[in-house]
Amino acid sequence: MTRSLDLAGRTALVTGAAQGIGLSMVRELLGRGARVVLVDRDEATLKKAAGTLDSSAIFVAVADVTDRDAMADVVTRSSEDFGPIDVVVANAGITPPPATIRTSNLAEFDRVMAVNLTGALNTIHPTLDGIVERRGHIVVVSSAAAFSPGLGGSAYMASKAAVEQVGRALRLELAHTGATVTVAYYGFVDTELARDTLDRDPLGARVGELLPWPMNRRVSPEHAAAVTVRAIERRAPRVVTPRLWGAYSASRDREPGDRRVDRAEPHGAHPHR
């Protein structure tokens, strides 16, 4: 499947859109001529971000991705203003303070899974019928943490490994419809979230010191967003940045299903409306 996706005139929904990678993603999408639905639970930061953007091309929604009904309502309301959603970027996520499994607060573990995994499902599920009808595209933001074992971050790593599998399953399940899925794997992105975890926390800083260069190199949110939006346009099945992490990921064998999807052609005709 090699069809490209022209983002001009399309509607994209991005969660975690108030700052960091999410806000950079919004700007990239707007730059391609898309309309964008910005979703975040931080109302003040979201409104501040929205004030820097073209108000005619955005729809701003304050919602928590863990609230299933609220996310379904966002999809309904934004579709009434902008039309059906063509692209979904399930980006919202949190990183807990570093802790070993033995010392972890299991309630914190549950919270990470609720935001990172269930939040992604709550974002994607209400859009799926429209995505299939319009042969749209979904991005699930996983992480290099999904395939890199390490200490002090089991909750985050487990959540991102689960998100990866959601994305890979969706790609297989939607292949016959013409809708497509990208799984995004980021290494270290220079956001406040990363600084809190790796710079300001003693255990996180120690873990960071154990990583050799260039595995510990950080990329900017703008870079992560740019390579991801290019992946959307190409309908790429995965995007990995920094690229070195791709070699690490490639050590895992490709599934036979991946090869079948690469050759698949969509059934029926669902022209873009």
Feature roles, as predicted:
Residues 3-35:
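Canonical Rossmann dinucleotide-binding motif of NAD(H)/NADP(H)-dependent dehydrogenases/reductases
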Residues 32-48:
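Conserved glycine-rich Rossmann-like NAD(P)H-binding loop of the short-chain dehydrogenase/reductase
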Residues 43-44, 62-73, 106:
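The beta1-alpha1 cofactor-binding region of Rossmann-like NAD(H)/NADP(H)-dependent oxidoreductases
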Residues 99-101, 105-110, 121, 135:
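Substrate-binding pocket helix/loop in short-chain dehydrogenase/reductase
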Residues 124, 159:
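Active-site helix of classical SDR
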Residues 143:
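Residue(s) in the substrate-gating loop at a strand-loop-helix junction
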Residues 172, 176-243:
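SDR active-site lid
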